[in-house]
C-alpha cells in the first residue's frame, strides 16, 4: 500500500512539474524510469515503435489506424498491412492484431485481400457504379472488379446488397456477371420482339445475335419469356449453338403443303419434307398423323396406297398365282418400302400362307406347292437308284435330319411345324427366319446382292442352304442350281431373281422330303446288321453287374492304388459297356456302325458327334467319364443313358443271390484259366486275384502292375509261408521281365556271358518251381474252402 501511495505521489509530482513553467524539469532518464515502473507494475500498456524512441498505447494505435483510413478516403490499399506498419512505425504484428480487433468490434469495416475498407467507401463505390450503369445501360461485374481492384465475389455481394437502393438495375438471372438497367432490358426486349416478329422463315439464333448485336445470355433469357407469354408466335428447334427460331406462319405453310400433298397422292416422302426444312420428317409425320398411316423407310403411306396393295395381294392369293406389287405402288417407292409394306399387309387374317420373294413379290401357297410337283417322281427315282448304287449314303444322314425323321412325320407335317415356328418368330417382331409379318407364316425374304442385299435378311434360310451345300455327310437330293433349272423349264414366265429365291426356299423342304423317301426305302430293304435290343440288354446287364462288383473291391486298397484300379476298370469293362450303347443308338438313328470290340476312342467320338443334340449331350458326358479317376461319374451317366428316352434298357438290380452266382462263376473261370496258364507273370496275376476273392469275398479286376500291391494286401490273410512264396515268385517274375526287356543289349564275351546264362537258367528253374507251388496253394485252398462250406 505504501508503494502505491508512493507511486501516486510521484505521478502527481510529475504532472505538476509538467504543468509548471519552471526551468527545472525531469530528465529523460527519469521519465523513462517512471514509465518503465508503470509498465512493470501493469498499470500502463504501451507499444514500442520500431526505432524504440517512442511509446504508443493500444488506444493511440487504433486512433492512428482509423485516422490513416480516413485520410485515404475510407480505403487503405495495403499489401498485408505493410504500408500501414511503415507509416505508424510499429511492429507489423501489433498492426495485424489491432486491425483484427477493430474488425471484430466495428462491423462497418472489412478487410479484403489486405485492403481495409469502411462502409462509407462502399457506399461511394455503389454510387459510382450506379452512375456508370445508368450511362451505359449494362455493366459487367468482372469489369467493376478490375476497376476497383476488388474480388469478383465481393463485388457481386456489394452490388446485390445495394440493388434498388443505391444501384438502380437488375442482375441477369442466367448470368450473374451482368448488371442491367430496367430501361436497357426494356429496349433490348422491344428490339428482340421486333426482329423475331419480322422473321418469316427458320433462322438460327446465332445469326440474329451476331447481326443485331444482342447480348447472348440476355437474348436467351428474354426469348424464353417472349415465347412462353406468346408475345411472339413461333417455336424453337435444335440444340445449343444451332438452335433456331421457327415462326408459326412458316410452320402453318409447311403443314398446309404436307396435308395437301398427302391428301392428293396418299403418301409423303421424307426427302420432300427435308427440302421444306423439316430435319426429321418421319417424327414430324408421326406427330402430325395418328390414324392408319404406315411409316416406311423413305415415306409415309395412307389408306389409298394400302388398298391398292391389298387388292393385288388378294387377287394373287385367291387365284393361286403370284404378283409383284412394285408396279402397283407410286414411283418413289424403294424395295425397302415394298418389303415393309408387305409385312403390314400380310398381318391381315387369311394371308398366313403367303410367301414373299425379292422383297416385293407375293406368291400363294398353292403356287409354291404346284412348283414342287415336278420333283415327286424325281425323288422316288433317285432314292431307288441311290439305295441300289450307293447304300453308304443312307448311313450318313445329318444330325438335323435324324431329329426330324425320328418322329416319322411326313412332308406336310414338317411344313406345318416349320410354319408354326416362323409364326412365332414373326409375332416376336424379328425380321430373320424368312418371316415378313406377324402372320406371315412361310414368307422368305432372301434377295440377291443387286437388290440392295436383301438376301442377308433371311439368316435362317441362307444358313440352311450353306449347311446343305457344305455338309458332305448330309443326304442330298438336288442342289439349288439344279432345282432352279427344273423350275426354269417348268415355269418359263418367272423372273430369274424370283426363280432363284424360290429354288433356295424349296431346297430344304425338298431335301427333307427326299430323306423321308430314302428312309422309307432303307426301312423297306431292312438292315440285318443291327443287333436286337434284347441281346444288347443282356450283354450290358452282365457287364454292368461285373463292373459294380469290381468297383466294390477298389475301396479295400489305399487311395493311390484305388486310382489305378478305377482307371483300369473304366478303360476295360466300362468302355465295353459304352461301346455297346453307342453302337445301339447309332444303329437306331441310321448311322454307320461297326463291331463294338474294334471301336477306338476316336471312332466312338465321331459317332457321338453325328447324333441328334438330345442324344449327343448325355453320350458325350458318358464318354468323358471314361477318362476320370473315379467310377462314380460313369455310373451316374450310365443310368441316364440306359434310361427312358435313350437306350431304354432294363437294368436288373444286384441281390445276394446274383452276386454269389457271379462270384462262383468268376472263381471257376479263373481256376480253369490258372490250371492251363504257363506264363509266370499271368500265373501270378491269376493266383493273387483268386486269393483276394477268397479272403475278401470281393471280385477283383486289376492290371498287372498292381500285383505287388495285391500281394502286400494279402499279407494280412495268408500264412507267412504262403506270403513268402508269393513274394519270392513276384521277385522272380520281376527279374525275368527285367532280363527279357534287356535282351537287345549287346552281350559281353567270355565268362560274363556264361555267368549270365547260368543265372537265367537258375531263375527259370526257380520260377517253374514257384509256379507249381502257387497253383497247388490256390487250388488246394479252393478245395479246403469247398469242404468248409459243405
From Swiss-Prot:
Biological process according to GO: protein ufmylation; response to endoplasmic reticulum stress; reticulophagy
Key words, A-Z: Transferase, Ubl conjugation pathway
Recorded GO MF terms: UFM1 ligase activity; UFM1 transferase activity
Enzyme class: transferase
GO CC aspect terms: endoplasmic reticulum membrane
Bias-annotated ranges (Gly residues): 429-439
A Pfam family of this chain: UFL1
Keyword Cytoplasm included in the entry's annotation: no
Ranges of biased composition (kind: Acidic residues): 743-754
EC numbers on record: 2.3.2.-
Biased amino acid composition, Basic and acidic residues: 412-424
Stretches for region Disordered: 404-478, 741-762
Family recorded in the similarity comment: Belongs to the UFL1 family.
Function: E3 UFM1-protein ligase that mediates ufmylation of target proteins.
Protein's recorded name: E3 UFM1-protein ligase 1 homolog
Organism: Nematostella vectensis
Amino acid at each position: 500500500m505504501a508503494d502505491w501511495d508512493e507511486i501516486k505521489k510521484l505521478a502527481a509530482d510529475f504532472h505538476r512539474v509538467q504543468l509548471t513553467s519552471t526551468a527545472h524539469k525531469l530528465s529523460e532518464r527519469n521519465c523513462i524510469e517512471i514509465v518503465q515502473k508503470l509498465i512493470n507494475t501493469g498499470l500502463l500498456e504501451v507499444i514500442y515503435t520500431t526505432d524504440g524512441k517512442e511509446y504508443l498505447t493500444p488506444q493511440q494505435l487504433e486512433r492512428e489506424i482509423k485516422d490513416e483510413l480516413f485520410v485515404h478516403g475510407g480505403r487503405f490499399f495495403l499489401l498485408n498491412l505493410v504500408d500501414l506498419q511503415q507509416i505508424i512505425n510499429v511492429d507489423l504484428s501489433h498492426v495485424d492484431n489491432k486491425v483484427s480487433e477493430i474488425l471484430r468490434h466495428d462491423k462497418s469495416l472489412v478487410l479484403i485481400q489486405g485492403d481495409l475498407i469502411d462502409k462509407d467507401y462502399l457506399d461511394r463505390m455503389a454510387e459510382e457504379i450506379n452512375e456508370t450503369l445508368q450511362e451505359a445501360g449494362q455493366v459487367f461485374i468482372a469489369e467493376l472488379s478490375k476497376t476497383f481492384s476488388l474480388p469478383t465475389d465481393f463485388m457481386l455481394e456489394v452490388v446485390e446488397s445495394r440493388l434498388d437502393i443505391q444501384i438502380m438495375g437488375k442482375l441477369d438471372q442466367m448470368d450473374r456477371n451482368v448488371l442491367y438497367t430496367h430501361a436497357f432490358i426494356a429496349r433490348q426486349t422491344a428490339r428482340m420482339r421486333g426482329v423475331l416478329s419480322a422473321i418469316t422463315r427458320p433462322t438460327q439464333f446465332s445469326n440474329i445475335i451476331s447481326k443485331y448485336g444482342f447480348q447472348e445470355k440476355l437474348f436467351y433469357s428474354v426469348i424464353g419469356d417472349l415465347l412462353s407469354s406468346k408475345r411472339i408466335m413461333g417455336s424453337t428447334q435444335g440444340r445449343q449453338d444451332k438452335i433456331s427460331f421457327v415462326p408459326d406462319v412458316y410452320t402453318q405453310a409447311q403443314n398446309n403443303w404436307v396435308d395437301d400433298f398427302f391428301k392428293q397422292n396418299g403418301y409423303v416422302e421424307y426427302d420432300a419434307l427435308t427440302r421444306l426444312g423439316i430435319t426429321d420428317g418421319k417424327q414430324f409425320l408421326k406427330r402430325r398423323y395418328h390414324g392408319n398411316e404406315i411409316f416406311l423407310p423413305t415415306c409415309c403411306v395412307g389408306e389409298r396406297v394400302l388398298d391398292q396393295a391389298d387388292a393385288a395381294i388378294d387377287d394373287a392369293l385367291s387365284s393361286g398365282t403370284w404378283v409383284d406389287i412394285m408396279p402397283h405402288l407410286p414411283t418413289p417407292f424403294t424395295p425397302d418400302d415394298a418389303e415393309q409394306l408387305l409385312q403390314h399387309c400380310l398381318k391381315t387374317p387369311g394371308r398366313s400362307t403367303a410367301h414373299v420373294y425379292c422383297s416385293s413379290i407375293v406368291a400363294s401357297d398353292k403356287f409354291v406347292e404346284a412348283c414342287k410337283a415336278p420333283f415327286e417322281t424325281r425323288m422316288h427315282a433317285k432314292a431307288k437308284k441311290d439305295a441300289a448304287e450307293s447304300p453308304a449314303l443312307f448311313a450318313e444322314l445329318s444330325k438335323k435330319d435324324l431329329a426330324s425323321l425320328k418322329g416319322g412325320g411326313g412332308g406336310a407335317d414338317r411344313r406345318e411345324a416349320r410354319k408354326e415356328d416362323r409364326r412365332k418368330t414373326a409375332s416376336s417382331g424379328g425380321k430373320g427366319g424368312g418371316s415378313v409379318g406377324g402372320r406371315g407364316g412361310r414368307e422368305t425374304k432372301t434377295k440377291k446382292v443387286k437388290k440392295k442385299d436383301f438376301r442377308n435378311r433371311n439368316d435362317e434360310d441362307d444358313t440352311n442352304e450353306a449347311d446343305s451345300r457344305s455338309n458332305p455327310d448330309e443326304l442330298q437330293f438336288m442342289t439349288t442350281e439344279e432345282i432352279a433349272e427344273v423350275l426354269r423349264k417348268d415355269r418359263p414366265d418367272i423372273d430369274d431373281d424370283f426363280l432363284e429365291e424360290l429354288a433356295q426356299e424349296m431346297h430344304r423342304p425338298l431335301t427333307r422330303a427326299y430323306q423321308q423317301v430314302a428312309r422309307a426305302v432303307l426301312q423297306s430293304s431292312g438292315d440285318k446288321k443291327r443287333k436286337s435290343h434284347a441281346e444288347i440288354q443282356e450283354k450290358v446287364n452282365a457287364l454292368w453287374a461285373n463292373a459294380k462288383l469290381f468297383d466294390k473291391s477298389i475301396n479295400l486298397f489305399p487311395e493311390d492304388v484305388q486310382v489305378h484300379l478305377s482307371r483300369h476298370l473304366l478303360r476295360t469293362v466300362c468302355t465295353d459297356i459304352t461301346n455297346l450303347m453307342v453302337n445301339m443308338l447309332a444303329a437306331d438313328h441310321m448311322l454307320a456302325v461297326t463291331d463294338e470290340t474294334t471301336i477306338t476312342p476316336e471312332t466312338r467320338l465321331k459317332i457321338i458327334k453325328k447324333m441328334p443334340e438330345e442324344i449327343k449331350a448325355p453320350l458325350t458326358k458318358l464318354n468323358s467319364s471314361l477318362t476320370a479317376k473315379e467310377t462314380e461319374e460313369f455310373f451316374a451317366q450310365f443310368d441316364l443313358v440306359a434310361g427312358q428316352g435313350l437306350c431304354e434298357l432294363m437294368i436288373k438290380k444286384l441281390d445276394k443271390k446274383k452276386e454269389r452266382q457271379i462270384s462262383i462263376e468268376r472263381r471257376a473261370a479263373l481256376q480253369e484259366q490258372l490250371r492251363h496258364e504257363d506264363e509266370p507273370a499271368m500265373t501270378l496275376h491269376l493266383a493273387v486275384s483268386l486269393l483276394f476273392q477268397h479272403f475278401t469275398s470281393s471280385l477283383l479286376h486289376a492290371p498287372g502292375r498292381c500285383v505287388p500291391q495285391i500281394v502286400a494286401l494279402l499279407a494280412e490273410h495268408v500264412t507267412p509261408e504262403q506270403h513268402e512264396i508269393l513274394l519270392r515268385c513276384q521277385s522272380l517274375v520281376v527279374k525275368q521281365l527285367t532280363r527279357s526287356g534287356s535282351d537287345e543289349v549287346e552281350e559281353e564275351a567270355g565268362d560274363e556271358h556264361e555267368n549270365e546264362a547260368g543265372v537265367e537258367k537258375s531263375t527259370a528253374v526257380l520260377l517253374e518251381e514257384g509256379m507249381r507251388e502257387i497253383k497247388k496253394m490256390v487250388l488246394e485252398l479252393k478245395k479246403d474252402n469247398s469242404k468248409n462250406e459243405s
